[in-house]
Amino acid sequence: MYKSVETILVDIPTIRPHKLSVTTMQTQTLVLIKIITEDGIVGWGEATTIGGLNYGEESPESVKANIDTYFKPLLLSIKAPLNVAQTLKLIRKSINGNRFAKCAIQTALLEIQAKRLNVPVSELLGGRIRDRLPVLWTLASGDTDKDIAEAKKMIELKRHNTFKLKIGSNPLQHDVDHVIAIKKALGPEISVRVDVNRAWSELECVKGIQQLQDGGIDLIEQPCAIENTDALARLTARFDVAIMADEVLTGPDSAYRIAKKSGADVFAVKVEQSGGLIEACEVAKIARLAGISLYGGTMLEGPVGSIASAHAFSTFETLEFGTELFGPLLLTQSILKTPLQYENFELVVPNTPGLGIEVDEDKLEQLRRH
């Protein structure tokens, strides 16, 4: 079945410091998976995280170690022909947790199958509804004037016209004033959202969200702690502005629990956080049945993970709040022979077999961590 499984770490500087409540990034480490079948078909996947262990339970180094130690021997031991579902069932039975690693493996397996069938990965997920996805830009320099200038430049270039601000690392009032100043500078026609990255207590949320709602902000992402799902539900019921669940979503099980208690207005669906493209589509289905709006999230992946996400998001029946698949644009270097196509505020989803990308392996060799 499988001839080789390789895990590659690639450290690429960002175009500017990217400030979150949990860390400030100046370099992103891409975790790439390359699987080759015995008949020579290559599949790529990505398991990139944010800020090492600052954001979640898996780090680039732990993902590589676990794939090399556990996933790789398991895949190479498969002799009988198994389809993707059978292979994923075997992995689930043999390996607990490791959602990001499992997502990367699943992506590579789906790309192999899609190439074998000569179809895009989106076809294996039910077929796409859209060929283009709206993509916002995150303003995260932490400097109000710089963020305003950056936003205006993006609008002028027709690259982004919706913006998200990372807040939560400064005193609450400082962050609120920063956001509202940017919203006023950009005007009523431009959508501005915030991501608190779980930094506020429930009392702080009440104070901050009220001001942000009054200031014209139209989406508040994960304002309180992951563990406090009851607080998230109370905030959702209390405010008119949309409250979005992010870090609290770790796959279909958590999506069901949040939906059952009306715990959010919007779900930020992330393929890695969900455990795979298939699971991300299941999260989207739960949201739709519960009347919860959808947003395509990112782990600031490079082009492999971003376009894999795009294939999944292209199949969603609704995508009311667009996506944030800007990860490759945050990096100073590309690892593709042809970069992803961003134009007119959107990302074009390739219609060629597999993920529809070609990794530049010479460039990868130059950049990889040895």
From Swiss-Prot:
Q: Which domain of life is it from?
A: Bacteria
Annotated Mn(2+) binding sites: 195, 221, 246
Q: Where is the active site?
A: 166
Question: Mind listing the UniProt keywords for this protein, alphabetically?
Answer: Aromatic hydrocarbons catabolism, Isomerase, Manganese, Metal-binding
Example of a GO MF term: muconate cycloisomerase activity
Q: What is its EC number?
A: 5.5.1.1
Query: Among the record's GO biological process terms, what is one?
Result: beta-ketoadipate pathway
- Required cofactor names: Mn(2+)
Pfam families reported for this sequence = MR_MLE_C, MR_MLE_N
Q: Which SUPFAM superfamilies match?
A: Enolase C-terminal domain-like, Enolase N-terminal domain-like
Pathway involvement of the protein, from the record: Aromatic compound metabolism; beta-ketoadipate pathway; 5-oxo-4,5-dihydro-2-furylacetate from catechol: step 2/3
- Which InterPro entries does the record match to this protein? Chloromuconate_cycloisomerase, Enolase-like_C_sf, Enolase-like_N, Enolase_C-like, Mandel_Rmase/mucon_lact_enz_CS, Mandelate_racemase_C, Mandelate_racemase_N_dom
Query: Which transformation does this protein catalyse, written as a reaction?
Result: (S)-muconolactone = cis,cis-muconate + H(+)
Looking up NCBIfam families in the UniProt record yields: mucon_cyclo
Q: How does it assemble?
A: Homooctamer.
Q: What does this protein do?
A: Catalyzes a syn cycloisomerization.
Similarity comment: Belongs to the mandelate racemase/muconate lactonizing enzyme family.
The protein in question is named Muconate cycloisomerase 1
Organism this protein belongs to: Acinetobacter baylyi (strain ATCC 33305 / BD413 / ADP1)
Q: Which gene encodes it?
A: catB
